[in-house]
């Protein structure tokens, strides 16, 4: 079942409430969340409470109680935090703001198994990495690991303010009831028309197929930049959501990019984040690479 919101932050707020309501209905007494270090889930109160960056949380403390942070891609770290009060584990299959870190297959499978064994809900935040960006409609599909709750936004409206969180039927049966949650403009006709149109275009133009065709070329060109410039130490990511670790000051890189007419953004640490349109072609990637060569020289 799907509940429409106005943004990704709102989608994550709804997901957290849905998880708490699930535990409440079952009478388990569970309320704690385990989130990941370097994660980003939004700036509203609940979403920022599960965001793994001190810089986002500290100015607004005390925040929502019962949140613990585990090391991303470290299953033992997660296991050490699980107890009888754990309600849900929330993670991004591919961390964007946190520095373009991709979850391993072992980690995703381990989280799913841990949740199944302890009646804990698995929440995947795909606000940024979903909608075809990693080569499947949603990133979790690339792992074959289905979450209990999925959040999405950004690309589902192609610029129109809209987000959503989806629950499995089992979770929905125990979760939000009429009056538990609401959004004045959630599911409004304009936003939902945009979503319907976007999904139609995805299917008609095989957008996910295009991502899979173009992504290897994108990766190849980023690897060329890494090989060519000593200041580029690592390439990270998957599909059309990738990053380069740079030793030069990122502000300097960003300023030069603006001069070149190239829109890039910094991720956690010295990482340049590349999140091109899903309809990008080789010629656009070539133009980007030439601009980056001038910027990094």
Role assignments for model-derived ranges:
Residues 1-297:
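Conserved N-terminal phosphate-binding loop of PLP-dependent enzymes in the Aspartate aminotransferase
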């Amino acid at each position: 079942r799907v509940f429409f919101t106005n943004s990704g932050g709102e989608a994550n707020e709804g997901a957290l409430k849905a998880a708490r309501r699930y535990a409440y209905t079952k009478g388990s007494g569970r309320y704690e969340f385990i989130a990941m270090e370097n994660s980003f889930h939004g700036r509203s109160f609940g979403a920022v409470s599960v965001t793994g960056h001190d810089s986002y949380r500290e100015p607004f403390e005390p925040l929502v109680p019962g949140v613990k942070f585990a090391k991303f891609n470290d299953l033992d770290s997660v296991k050490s935090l699980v107890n009888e009060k754990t309600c849900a584990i929330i993670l991004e299959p591919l961390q964007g703001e946190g520095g373009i870190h991709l979850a391993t297959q072992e980690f995703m499978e381990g989280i799913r198994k841990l949740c199944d064994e302890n009646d804990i809900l698995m929440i995947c935040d795909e606000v940024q990495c979903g909608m075809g960006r990693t080569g499947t409609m949603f990133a979790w599909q690339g792992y074959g690991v289905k979450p209990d709750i999925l959040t999405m936004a950004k690309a589902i409206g192609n610029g129109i303010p809209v987000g959503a969180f989806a629950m499995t039927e089992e979770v929905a049966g125990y979760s939000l009831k009429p009056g538990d949650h609401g959004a004045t403009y959630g599911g409004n006709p304009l936003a939902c028309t945009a979503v319907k149109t976007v999904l139609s275009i995805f299917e008609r133009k095989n957008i996910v197929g295009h991502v899979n065709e173009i992504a290897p070329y994108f990766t190849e060109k980023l690897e060329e930049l890494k090989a060519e410039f000593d200041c580029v130490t690592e390439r990270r990511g998957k599909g059309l959501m990738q990053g380069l670790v740079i030793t030069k000051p990122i502000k300097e890189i960003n300023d030069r990019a603006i001069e070149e007419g190239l829109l890039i953004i910094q991720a956690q640490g010295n990482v340049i984040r590349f999140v091109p349109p899903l309809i990008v072609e080789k010629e656009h990637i070539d133009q980007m690479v030439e601009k980056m060569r001038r910027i990094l020289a």
